[in-house]
């Protein structure tokens, strides 16, 4: 059965063997007053419960790049992503939260290190836990296996630990215009975006955000049409999507996942809820805050 990614992302839950693995908690539509932009709040707290959950979480996030539902749960995609960046995993692995307990003997092998990627990209919770991510765990193991008495990549979290993760680790899916996206990614959190390098507008049509001040401007309307016409003309002439996409104006929409640790989320709200923030990115923060209430 063929299913579009838009339909896939509108599913409220991702199942494995009849159990809910990843769940969309709630959503805020029409954040930019054009019936296109949105923010969704997702639950990835069980992503590190077992290996199957890891694969589903990672391929769920990575599939946004390719807009291909077949990517979901694909072990071949997972294995490719594991060695995507100079033999180390892609950023989609950052969407698997890992909770390390200072009272757990196995976890202590990682936590006792003066320096580690787990610590660098993690946050201390309640003076007992380190909330980090699976990509950092893999980096630490691959960089120096001799430091550990076992394969730390096999560390999974318990159901009780997943409840703690759910309280602190927040994942959102955004649909915003390019300038808003550019402001968002200045925040050093985990991001994964739709890639127009791989996905042509023949498969996923372009959508455009036209602000209130530009809606009645005929030249803006003409620019949108001209850019789309040129894009498709380039494709017909053999130009690849990764080159043809350069003619699309900044008002184009994109989709992007974001995963926030507690301090990262606080910083995002501090800067983007401020009255001096640009209206569009402020709407993302307002929507996120409402979804978390």
Which functions belong to the PLM regions below?
Residues 2-293:
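Family-specific signature for flavin-dependent thymidylate synthase
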